[in-house]
């Protein structure tokens, strides 16, 4: 039997808690660590709609990127149906759905969010952008104009709009940073 704590441990093996920024709130945020898990819903955020979907599909666990209570200093003062967060937590608890969130630790982890961005853009010889390992910097396999590089960004990341200033310099070294990086 797989339990919530087993999945949390597996996720921490990939993206350790100590990679999270000090202000971040990661791990099991709602639910029972000992509960059995048969169905998991994966989501970017834990919203009212996601909680309702998890309940409707009979999920035992939501694994999300963004924390439900988004900062370590955000101490829940109340849980009521008067606001979206309260309704979300109430729905989860009523339906025995736990929620694990892996945020900046997943951004920083080897093979995590920033490595995925760098790989998608074809960056080579990547290394962490900061001491906290948030972001990555690497090189393209060949120089490109900014417009050529941005066409790749649109193509490989599915962007529908970009703002830029073309200084006429070729692009060879690129930094990427998802979420908390900037």
Predicted regions, residues:
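Hydrophobic structural segments
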Residues: 1-182
């Amino acid at each position: 039997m797989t339990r919530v704590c087993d999945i949390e441990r597996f996720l921490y093996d990939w993206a350790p808690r100590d990679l999270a920024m000090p202000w971040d709130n990661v791990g099991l945020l709602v639910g029972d660590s000992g509960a059995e898990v048969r169905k998991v819903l994966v989501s970017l955020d834990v919203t009212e709609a996601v909680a309702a979907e998890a309940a409707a599909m009979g999920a035992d666990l939501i694994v999300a990127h963004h924390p439900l209570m988004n900062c370590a200093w955000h101490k829940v003062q109340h849980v009521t149906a008067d606001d979206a967060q309260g309704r979300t937590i109430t729905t989860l608890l009523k339906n025995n759905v736990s929620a694990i969130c892996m945020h900046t630790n997943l951004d920083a982890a080897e093979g995590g969010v920033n490595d995925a961005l760098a790989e998608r853009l074809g960056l080579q010889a990547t290394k962490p952008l900061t001491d906290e390992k948030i972001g990555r910097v690497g090189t393209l396999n060949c120089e490109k104009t900014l417009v050529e590089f941005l066409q790749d960004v649109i193509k490989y990341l599915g962007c529908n709009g970009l703002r830029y200033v073309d200084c006429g310099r070729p692009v060879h070294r690129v930094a990427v940073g998802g979420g908390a990086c900037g």
